[in-house]
Every structure is written in structure tokens, then in C-alpha cells.
Amino acid sequence: MSDTLNRLAEVLEERKHAAPDSSYVASLYHKGLNKILEKLGEESVETIIAAKDAEHSKDYSDVIYETADLWFHSLVMLSALGQHPQAVLDELERRFGLSGHDEKAARQPSA
């Protein structure tokens, strides 16, 4: 896993045990999963809007910024659920060489 993701995962774990007023992330953890999911939803919408704007303007700085926020809040959510970013990377690695159609079909129950 990248050094950046490892460092971020470590910081997120540390923030779980910090006072809510000590950092933004600590305050999110203190407010609970629903607040974290609310933020994740907001960041998802902001990323979509930035992507639509970038399509026309060809200025990608906002979509990069918003995607970073989206990834960050996704990592906060995973951490709140006791999951490490490596689990997502492992899942992405598992999907290499697997057709998206085949993967989707494997998830659907047979009739």
C-alpha cells in the first residue's frame, strides 16, 4: 500500500481515541457513523458536480480536490467500521483479470 495511505490510516486510528475538539476527524468519530455517512454523501455530490464542471471547462483541479475529499471521507468511514484501507486494495487486486460482467453475475443469486 502507498506510504500516504498507510500514514493516513495510522492518523485516522489515532484520531479515534482523541478528544472531539482536538481535530475534525476526532469530531466526526465522536458524532458517529451517521454523521460520517452524511459527510460522505455530501462529498460524493460535490465530486459529481466537479466532474460535470470539469467536462466543460477542462479545468480538473476541483475534481481532483473533491475526489481527495471523497476518498478521505471513505477512509474515515472504513476506519469507523474497523476496516483498513488495505482491504479495499486487496479487493481491487482480486478483481484484476476478472470481467466486470462476470464479477457482477457472480454476486447475483440464481433464480
From Swiss-Prot:
GO biological process, one term: L-histidine biosynthetic process
Record keyword Kinase present: no
InterPro entries linked to this entry: HisE (IPR008179), PRib-ATP_PPHydrolase-like (IPR021130)
Any single GO CC term annotated in Swiss-Prot or TrEMBL for this entry: cytoplasm
Key words of the record: Amino-acid biosynthesis, ATP-binding, Cytoplasm, Histidine biosynthesis, Hydrolase, Nucleotide-binding
Listed CDD domains: NTP-PPase_HisIE_like
Span of the signal peptide: none
Top enzyme class: hydrolase
Catalyses which reaction(s): 1-(5-phospho-beta-D-ribosyl)-ATP + H2O = 1-(5-phospho-beta-D-ribosyl)-5'-AMP + diphosphate + H(+)
Top-rank lineage group of the source organism: Bacteria
Pathway(s) per entry: Amino-acid biosynthesis; L-histidine biosynthesis; L-histidine from 5-phospho-alpha-D-ribose 1-diphosphate: step 2/9
Protein's UniProt keywords contain Magnesium: no
Compartments it resides in: Cytoplasm
Enzyme Commission no: 3.6.1.31
Molecular function, one GO term: phosphoribosyl-ATP diphosphatase activity
Family: Belongs to the PRA-PH family.
Entry-linked NCBIfam families: histidine_hisI (TIGR03188), PRK00400.1-3 (NF001611)
The name this protein goes by in its record: Phosphoribosyl-ATP pyrophosphatase
Organism of provenance: Pseudomonas putida (strain GB-1)
Gene coding for it: hisE
